[in-house]
Amino acid sequence: MARTKKANDEVPTNSDSLKLKVAKQAAKLVKDEMVVGLGSGSTANLFIQELGKRIVEEELYIYGVPTSFDSRMVASTAGIPLISLDQCGEIDIAVDGADEVCKSTLSLIKGGGGCHTMEKIVDYHAKEFIVLADEGKLVDSLGDKTPVPLEVIPFAYSTVLNKLLKMNTAPAIRTGSGKMGPVITDSGNMIIDVFISIDDAEETENMLNNIPGVLENGVFSKCDKVLVGTSKKVEILKK
């Protein structure tokens, strides 16, 4: 008897297949006895699952450093031993996703899931920071389609909003589904999303972080390599 499709069944998309393709490729880059930064988000979760398979099948000794409660749960389910940032002297490689990737500079916008602060701490601490993306995430310039998220201390949200308004932007407090009120990060802070023109990623990153009350923003100016899933192959972009 044929199974009746339910309304909430997830149907794999072309984007999903491209994400899985780059996740599998990235998992092959991890070597035995490495400490790996585990990013957050749908693509990073696929990488975590593929890495877990390798650990089990090849009996590898690998430790993961999660960047969110979500990545911690996915890694635990995948069988990846976890350690905290203060337990590891070095992180050999960090693998994460992105919301936008600038083709010419490999700068990024991250934080659609509200995890960018802990992601940036881990990603920037790693010896090598690798980003996974499907070809739909590539852009000529950052910020035209995707807002930059700012993690903001709740005490300062109104002053941060006022500062952003004076910069001729249109900031918005991020609200969530399943609860009333603003999205609250794993660290207990709020998210303000703002569309802003980004000509120089490092300059914008530093400028936004200099606003009192902003803990961290979603502009990532540092990235070593991007694995891009296309319909034909996985392309590798390097600086």
From Swiss-Prot:
Tell me, what is one Gene Ontology molecular-function annotation carried by this entry?
ribose-5-phosphate isomerase activity
Q: Name one GO biological process term.
A: D-ribose metabolic process
Q: What is its EC number?
A: 5.3.1.6
Q: Which reaction does it catalyse?
A: aldehydo-D-ribose 5-phosphate = D-ribulose 5-phosphate
Q: In which pathway does it act?
A: Carbohydrate degradation; pentose phosphate pathway; D-ribose 5-phosphate from D-ribulose 5-phosphate (non-oxidative stage): step 1/1
Annotated keywords: Isomerase
User: Which InterPro entries has this protein been placed in?
Assistant: NagB/RpiA_transferase-like (IPR037171), Ribose5P_isomerase_typA_subgr (IPR020672), Ribose5P_isomerase_type_A (IPR004788)
Binding positions (substrate): 40-43, 96-99, 110-113, 137
Q: Which SUPFAM superfamilies match?
A: D-ribose-5-phosphate isomerase (RpiA), lid domain (SSF75445), NagB/RpiA/CoA transferase-like (SSF100950)
Catalytic residues as annotated in Swiss-Prot or TrEMBL: 119 (proton acceptor)
Q: What role does this protein play? A: Catalyzes the reversible conversion of ribose-5-phosphate to ribulose 5-phosphate.
Assembly, in brief, is: Homodimer.
For this entry, the protein name equals Ribose-5-phosphate isomerase A
Organism, as annotated: Methanococcus maripaludis (strain C5 / ATCC BAA-1333)
